[in-house]
Amino acid sequence: MSDIPFWQTKTLEDMTDAEWESLCDGCGQCCLHKLMDEDTDEIYFTNVACRQLNIKTCQCRNYERRFEYEPDCIKLTRENLPTFEWLPVTCAYRLLAEGKPLPKWHPLIVGSKAAMHAERISVRHIAVKESEVVDWQDHILNKPDWAQ
């Protein structure tokens, strides 16, 4: 049996569903709402978390049934990955699609999410609950480093 991790030997297309799912580092960046300018199609990042995101753990409260609770939730697949230009530069799906390695803090490498949180990759330090937002425009972020 090889000691080389699956993400270094398989393409995204060749990964099993379990391998595909395990690539997600659980940072929660995908679960922050984005606003789109209707005239320019420019995407603005906010710090407003989806109602299903547990901000402390950066995990979806209802992952298996998320589309029932959040019809606008978008499922990232092998087929639609190229259309998600807004994925963070730290996203394993994006990195592997671009032929780049996983970052040293990635949970698949270090075995836990602690390093990711320590590096402030996760949204737990910036996210606010959707229910607490009055004016969404007040929550637009300058383009975060992770979105470059």
From Swiss-Prot:
It comes from the Bacteria. NCBIfam families: PRK05170.1-1, PRK05170.1-5, PRK05170.2-1, PRK05170.2-5. Belongs to the UPF0260 family. This is UPF0260 protein YcgN. It comes from Escherichia fergusonii (strain ATCC 35469 / DSM 13698 / CCUG 18766 / IAM 14443 / JCM 21226 / LMG 7866 / NBRC 102419 / NCTC 12128 / CDC 0568-73).
